[in-house]
């Protein structure tokens, strides 16, 4: 027993020290964050972007490795044991439409303002969240959120578990209808980056 304890103390419980330069790679500065690249595409009407995303989706932490996702491509920090973090900034009344994550949990914490979170295929489940309230939505459940305050609101969004890629996110079928009404071809823009529009309990497996 003493030998095992000594081994653990000498090998597994050691600390490391890193430089300021190394730690800077683990710091995200809010003022330096920019919306996802597709949110800056001038060919996509703002109305269409608002159907799919928060007005500004700011990537804070991306996955380790070379995962090619919008969050990874713009995050200042990479690698946090499989967790990703974004900040969803929404003007009053705005928020993304119903969508499901097939494998991952999505956890929302209100950092500023008041939000309504809805869930299920018809959005029939509903709860209001105030500052610092948190809700964690499990995989395969349709969910949406909307700023119900009078000022700009901010949600912290954590994605954990499962595989974090575009195949994990599936929009509700009515999102495709909304996009087609806004502008011909805009749905295909989102589909080209991997979004699908089949999130419904009646969808084919």
Model-inferred region functions:
Residues 11-16, 144-205:
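Double-stranded beta-helix
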Residues 103-116:
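Glycine- and acidic-residue-biased ligand/ion/polar-headgroup-sensing regions
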């Amino acid at each position: 027993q003493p030998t095992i304890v000594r081994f653990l103390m000498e090998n597994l419980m050691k600390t490391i020290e890193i430089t300021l330069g190394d730690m800077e790679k683990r710091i995200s500065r809010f003022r330096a964050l920019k919306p996802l690249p597709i949110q800056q595409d001038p060919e996509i009407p703002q109305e269409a972007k608002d159907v799919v995303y928060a007005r500004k989706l700011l990537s804070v932490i991306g996955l380790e490795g070379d995962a090619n996702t919008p969050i990874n491509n713009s995050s200042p920090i990479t690698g946090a044991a499989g967790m990703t973090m974004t900040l969803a900034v929404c003007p009053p009344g705005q928020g993304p439409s119903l969508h499901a994550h097939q494998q991952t949990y999505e956890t929302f914490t209100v950092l500023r303002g008041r939000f309504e979170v809805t869930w299920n295929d018809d959005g029939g489940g509903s709860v209001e969240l105030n500052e610092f309230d948190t809700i964690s939505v499990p995989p395969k459940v349709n969910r949406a959120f909307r700023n119900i305050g009078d000022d700009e609101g901010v949600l912290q969004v954590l994605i954990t578990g499962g595989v974090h890629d575009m195949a994990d996110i599936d929009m509700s079928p009515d999102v495709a209808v909304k996009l087609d009404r806004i502008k011909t071809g805009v749905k295909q823009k989102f589909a080209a980056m991997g979004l699908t529009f089949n999130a419904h309990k009646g969808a084919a497996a």
